[in-house]
Every structure is written in C-alpha cells, then in structure tokens.
Amino acid sequence: AASDVYKRQVMAFPNTYFSNLNNKGAFNNLSSVKEEVLKMFDPSFDPYATPTEGEASVPDRFGAKDVEDLTWKSLMDAYTCTECGRCTSACPASQTGKLLSPRKIIMDTRDRLEEVGANKRNNGPDFKDNKSLLGDYISEEEIWACTSCNACVQECPVSIDPLSIIIDLRRYLVMEESKVPSELAGMLTNIENNGAPGQFAQADRNNWVDE
C-alpha cells in the first residue's frame, strides 16, 4: 500500500542516522566470547572467583534464530526497506545464480517480525508458533551463499545492512547447531589447531623462505 511506502520513506531518516560508520568488512564480536578468550590468556585470572557486577554474562543464545534475537537496528532496517532491489542487483551471489537475495532477506525479516507481533497481540506475549526466521523464512542455503563482500550494504541508499542479519543467522548455525558447510569445516579445524586457516603448524610458517 502507498501508506506503507511513505512510512518506510520516513524511517529512512533515523535509519541512516543510526547506521554503522565503521569501515565495511569489520564484523562486530561477541563480547561474552571475547571476555572469555582474554581471561584464558590472563595468568592472574581466578576461574573460581565470583563474577563482578556488570561483567559480561553468557547470552541465552549465540547468534540469531528468530527476529527476537536480532538487534534493534536490524529490525529497523527491515521496516525501512522500500524494496528497490539495488542490493540484490549488486550481489555477486545473486548475479551468479545463487539462491541468495539480500532484498528477500530484509523482506523475510519484516514479514516474520509482523507475524510475531500479530501473534503476540492476538494470543498474548508468551505465545509461540513453533516457527522461526531461520528455516521457515530464510534457508541455510541462502545465508551460506553470501560472500560477506558488503556490496548490498554499499549500494543501499538508506544504509540498510542485510549482511548483519546473515552473519547473526550463521553464528547461530555454527555456535548453537554446529552446522558448518564442508568447505568451511576444514578451515575452522586449521584455525583451532594451527592458529591460522592454512594446514601448517606455526613453527613451519616460514619454511617457504628457505625453499
């Protein structure tokens, strides 16, 4: 409806104001995970000490499975999109025939958000419909087709960020469901064992100089 388009155009102003000004390609980290890693390398840290007030706690869920797990900015993005399609036109995955469409990611997020809101209004705040954004609206194939190139973010005239939603959905799959494409499983194993994506131990990294 025309009124919906006007509402989204009005939302463009606050959405642009609150857009991320950091260099594109710099992903945000999970504070709870970062704090745990820092503690591991701190010889003075007492693992049995009582947590201090204000200390980062373990989140209920890593990443996002449904719209309630997304940030408020991602939800604002969903309500701001006017469906112009510039993001999908610039997406290399979409251009090469992959299932991914950044425009659809945003539209699916908005549709799911409206569905959740309607369910809560009609059935109470604790109502669960046993559906989720990941799986019922956005497939695993879609989010793993993304190359994280930020072309969609760069092209959006109102600073919508579909990539943040994709990254949060991926984080859920990896950290909560342990679902990783086979192409990435080897890389993650190498990082765990060698501290780098390559299949070389840290002591052997400079061997190529002598060859």
Regions found by a protein language model. Give the residues of each.
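Iron-sulfur-cluster electron-transfer modules
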Residues: 69-78, 113, 117-211
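Non-transmembrane accessory domains of multi-pass membrane transporters/channels
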Residues: 30-99, 200-203
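Membrane-spanning helices that line or support transport/gating and their immediate boundary helices
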Residues: 10-17, 165-168
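Juxtamembrane inter-helical linkers in multi-pass membrane proteins
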Residues: 14-44, 108-115, 175, 179
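Short, small-residue-biased leader/transition segments that mark boundaries at the very start
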Residues: 1-6
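Short cysteine clusters
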Residues: 81-87, 91, 105, 146-152, ...
